Every structure is written in C-alpha cells, then in structure tokens.
Amino acid sequence: MKIVLASKSPRRRELLSNLGLDFEVIESNVEEFSSEKHPSRYVMDLSFNKAMSVAKKLKEEAIVIGADTIVVIEDKVLGKPKDRDEAFIMLKNLQGRVHTVYTGITIVRTKDFKYVSDFEETKVWIKKLEDEEIFNYIDTGEGYDKAGAYAIQGVGALIVEKIEGDYFNVVGLPISKLFDILKREFDVRLL
C-alpha cells in the first residue's frame, strides 16, 4: 500500500527513508493552529489536520502520516524561532532546565478514512550555557526551523545533557509508536 508523509520536515523524511520505506511526500500546507490547550491534544490536533488534508486530496488508496512537534517548558509552548533574537531567548530559557518535547502523529487510511491519532512525550535537559555558546550554536543555523531552536541530531547534540524517553520523538517522529500503530491498527508491517 502506498505510504504518504504529510510533512515538509526533512528530518521526518530522513527518518522514514532510514527505515527503507518507499513513500511519497505531499505537504499539507494547513495553518498550524489549534484551539486545544493541552500539549498532547494540541499536537494530535495539528497532526490530524495535516494528515486529513492530504488524505482528502488523494484519489488512490494510501496510508497518510501526519506529525507535529512542539517544545513545552513550564506550560509555555515554544515553536520555531522567527529570528536570531527569538532563538537566543528560547535557548536561554531552556538551558540548565528540563523541558518536554511532544509529537503528535495521525495515520489516515484513505480507503475508509479510518484514522488513529496518538502522541509521544520526551523530557530533555539542556546544559547550562554561556551566552557566547548560545550565539555560536544559533549561528550554525540548524535550529531555525525546529521547535525550541535546537536540533538534537546535529550540532545541538552538544548542548543536550540528557533525555528521558524516545530520541526519535525529539527529532520529530516517534518511530516506535508509528510502527506499532501501523501494525496494530492498519495491518501495515514494516518488518
């Protein structure tokens, strides 16, 4: 069965490619807005909107995967930084503390529009950093298109002290949860 990733994230593409999956990418282009207040419901709502918008456009039978990731610290949601100053503020706020990364995933089968939404959460501790180190990291440019302004899979690994939970969730797609849902709910076997 055809698999479609409803995401423009290069990290999600890379994660699925690393699994050896044959898939197509179709960006959803939906507005990333949800009235949900709880982080887990918020990311599931956004992932649902992305997956369903792509699923409705498809003519052939497919499994569509949508995802959305946010960073939350003390009930404050951090999205992608708009500029260098906002990236600095985010990283300054995260450093020396723990935050939570939430990723919502939704899988939609176009044949009958059956869908399953779920989420993963991972605790991340960022090291205490000097301002110069924060600016040097920002100047690598890798954090601009990422929630929380850092990439754990890149140079950002240098600023992460530890994590508790799913590493791939922090990258942007909880692979194990995706595998389980595809197998259990849609009889799609990746192994």
UniProtKB/Swiss-Prot annotation:
Catalyzed reactions: dTTP + H2O = dTMP + diphosphate + H(+); UTP + H2O = UMP + diphosphate + H(+)
Obligatory cofactor(s): a divalent metal cation
Matching Gene3D superfamilies: 3.90.950.10
Taxonomic classification: Bacteria, Bacillati, Bacillota, Clostridia, Thermoanaerobacterales
Function: Nucleoside triphosphate pyrophosphatase that hydrolyzes dTTP and UTP. May have a dual role in cell division arrest and in preventing the incorporation of modified nucleotides into cellular nucleic acids.
Active site per the UniProt annotation: 68 (proton acceptor)
Keywords, sorted A to Z: Cytoplasm, Hydrolase, Nucleotide metabolism
InterPro entries noted in UniProt: ITPase-like_fam, Maf-like
GO cellular component: cytoplasm
EC number in record: 3.6.1.9
Top-rank taxon: Bacteria
UniProt GO BP: nucleotide metabolic process
Family recorded in the similarity comment: Belongs to the Maf family. YhdE subfamily.
Marked site positions, Important for substrate specificity: 11, 69, 153
UniProt GO molecular function: dTTP diphosphatase activity; UTP diphosphatase activity
PANTHER family membership: BIFUNCTIONAL DTTP/UTP PYROPHOSPHATASE/METHYLTRANSFERASE PROTEIN-RELATED (PTHR43213), BIFUNCTIONAL DTTP_UTP PYROPHOSPHATASE_METHYLTRANSFERASE PROTEIN-RELATED (PTHR43213:SF5)
Protein name: dTTP/UTP pyrophosphatase
